[in-house]
Amino acid sequence: MAATVAEALAVTDELALPLRAVGDLAAAAGVSREEVVVITQCASLGGKLPFDDASVGSVLAVIKKVENLGDLFITEISRVLKAGGMVLIQSSPSDQDPNNSIQRKLLLGGFVDVQASAASSQDSEHSVTIKAKKVSWSLGSSFPLKKATKGLPKIQIDDDSELIDEDSLLTEDDLKKPELPVVGDCEVGATRKACKNCTCGRAEAEEKVEKLNLTSEQINNPQSACGNCGLGDAFRCGTCPYRGLPAFKPGEKIALPGNFLAADM
């Protein structure tokens, strides 16, 4: 009855497998010697192993003739090995440079971390050991790719650099609170006349009105009998009291410009 699962598998193309090789495989796989399944004369299997896919933890192949370790047999070892499983191949040093040929076959078979060890002085018959590992992912598996995050460049500040205090750039005048002009400080009564020491601008406004010979009512609520007074000087008659003033809308206060009393020359 064919086995389906094994912690470790030892195969050889010879009639018997040295007990020492079985012990080495058990130690490398971290299992007891009794858990190692041994198959001899593997060349008679036709390149097939009686195990399910990904059912063997580790494989030790003791091969006397390199030609018995063909590409088909390498593929079969990869099939029965679990993902991340280890394979050890021991070969006779009598073959001409067998380790290079075996390493190439393992690499072409999809194994990684292929390494060849030095010859063992304790066992001259099987002395060249090549170790490899099956990839840890299965065929058809997928995994998300992590997008690289671009961080902002870090500014290196030299401790010896002299830093300027922003407050030291301000003068005493800059730190003083500005004095706002007093609005409407005239003690006006019902006539709303500017006081003697007017500082709110009412005296200047009254001076402009007196210059025009207009009443406050005509400034604050201008009206036009002909309908052209508010259109500007181009439409006003020669006796219009609003000549020289800007255009306005009837009923809206006339806004006198600040330079109204300034001389043209």
Curated annotation (Swiss-Prot):
Keyword Aminoacyl-tRNA synthetase applies: no
Transmembrane segments: none
Record-listed [4Fe-4S] cluster binding positions: 226, 229, 237, 240
Any one of the GO CC terms: cytoplasm
Region span, Linker: 144-175
Cofactors named for this entry: [2Fe-2S] cluster; [4Fe-4S] cluster
Region described as Fe-S binding site A: 186-200
Domain notes for this protein: The C-terminal domain binds 2 Fe-S clusters but is otherwise mostly in an intrinsically disordered conformation.
Entry's family note: Belongs to the anamorsin family.
Identification of the protein by name: Anamorsin homolog 1
